[in-house]
Amino acid sequence: MIKAILFDLDGLMVDSEPHSIASWQAVLAKRNVQFDQAALDSVLGQRVIETAELAIRLFHLPDRPEDLAQEKAEYQIAHLNGNVTAMPGLHELLDFVDQSGLKKAVASSGLRRYIDAVLTTTGVRDRFSVIISADDVINGKPAPDVFLAAAKKLNVHPENCLVLEDAPFGVQAAKAAGMTCFAVPNAHSHALELSLADRILSSLHEVKTILLSDE
């Protein structure tokens, strides 16, 4: 029985992947290098620190991972307005979750400051009392840490949690946590491997329909 829904942020709740990519490319352009699409796909859903580590390895950059990750996050936050919007069906789904008495949390690979900024920009910050970020866990996705931490904070057993994800690493993390997972791929993740998910949906609108049919 589902008692809580754990929401990924980037690419699931908000259409932010293009802005995230543009932010990385802007930061790397200062160093005269650029990620290709394969590199970007390989880190989709991971923490910013892990993407920074990849950039440093690929391009032999002198930066510390922490500094590069912070620079990217600061650029991304500074340019949020007009570049990040709520995914179709998000507000309606949050209304349904609240009306149903289900618990909910954001469980994201993003830094906490970034998550707060995005949720505020899209008008849903006050709808979440539980937010687990990259700052709160040792291991990022595909490790299950972020989802297990969210379940613990909500006081809900993992088997009673439904994770909504858009990326392969997130789906792997959810299943490693022993949770049900619905994948909702977007334009950037639709061609990636999401077969571990319990269901693959076309939009957030479908989540309510499925939960109602399972009652």
Where are these regions (language model features)?
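Alpha-helix N-cap/helix-start and coil->helix boundary motif
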Residues: S20-I21, G45, I49, M87, ...
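Metal-dependent phosphoesterase signature
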Residues: Q34, I56-E92, S100-L102
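Helix-loop "lid/cap" segments that line or gate small-molecule binding pockets
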Residues: V27, R47-P62, V118, A150-A151
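Residues at secondary-structure transition points
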Residues: D15-P18, F35-A39, V43-Q46, D63, ...
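An amphipathic alpha-helix signature
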Residues: I21, Q25, V48-E53, A69, ...
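Alpha-helical elements of Rossmann-like donor-binding domains used by nucleotide-donor carbohydrate transfer enzymes
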Residues: A22-A26, L54, E71, E92, ...
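Active-site neighborhood of HAD-like aspartate-dependent phosphohydrolases
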Residues: M1-S42
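Asp-based, Mg2+/Mn2+-dependent phosphohydrolase catalytic module
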Residues: M1-K3, D95-D98, L102, L111-E215
